[in-house]
Curated annotation (Swiss-Prot):
Residues 94-106 have a biased composition (Low complexity). It comes from Arabidopsis thaliana. One of its GO terms (molecular function) is lipid binding. Residues 110-238 are annotated as: 23 X 4 AA approximate repeat A. It holds the Pfam family Oleosin. Keywords: Extracellular matrix, Lipid droplet, Membrane, Repeat, Secreted, Transmembrane, Transmembrane helix. Lipid-binding oleosin involved in tapetum development, especially for the physiology of tapetosomes. Also implicated in the formation of pollen coat. The chain crosses the membrane at residues 14-34, 36-56, 62-82. InterPro entries: Oleosin. It comes from the Eukaryota. GO terms for biological process: post-embryonic development; reproductive structure development. The gene is GRP16. This is Tapetal oleosin GRP-16. GO terms for cellular component: extracellular region; membrane; monolayer-surrounded lipid storage body; pollen coat. Its main location: secreted.
Amino acid sequence: MLSFLIPVVQFFQVVIAAVASVVFLVFAGITFGASIVGLTIATPLFVIFSPILVPATIATTFLVGGATAAVALGVTAFALILWLFKHRIGVKPKNNPAPKGAPTKADQPGASGGASGDKPGEMSGAGGPSGDKPGGASGGGDKPGGASGGGPGGASGGASGGASGGASGGASGGASGGGPGGASGGGPGGASGGGPGGASGGASGDKPEGAPGDKPGGAWGGKPGKKPGHKPEGARGGKRLAWW
């Protein structure tokens, strides 16, 4: 007699089950959405404040920085050692300009010590004109120790220690060096003497007692005490004079 209530009760069961299913599905959706929002917000915070990632990031930074510094220091030390080695063995390193105020090649002594054509250490006009050998008088090409065209220790054009036509050992007009102890090439024991004001054995700047390669007291290429082709101690064409 109450059997007609069974379909009514089943209807309510289906309605209640459907409503419960919808409510549970809504709750599931809310939970899913909240999980997505929570994950989106928590992921950066986890990366920033993670007890694992934060120390790992710091350690990685220090390791990379230390490795870079070590490599840079190693390369610098190797380059410095190589530079010092090259400098030690005398190889000048490239791209190393001289410091400011350092002397140049033009400032070094002896770089411009002589005029054009002179030998090192000679100045034009001191001991010889440009191109002359040291100690030669004007009239380039003469050997040192000789006056212009004359033998060493004599006046211009005269023999050693004597004027043209005069006795060996006497200057023209009785200049100093006449008697014993006279000019080069005169009597024994004669001091090397030339023209007035001359250095020992020749004109100013000449070497004493003759040019290079000449015998002492002789004219150019001559024997001691005589001119080329003349008798010893005599004037041109004259007889041998006795010692005074």
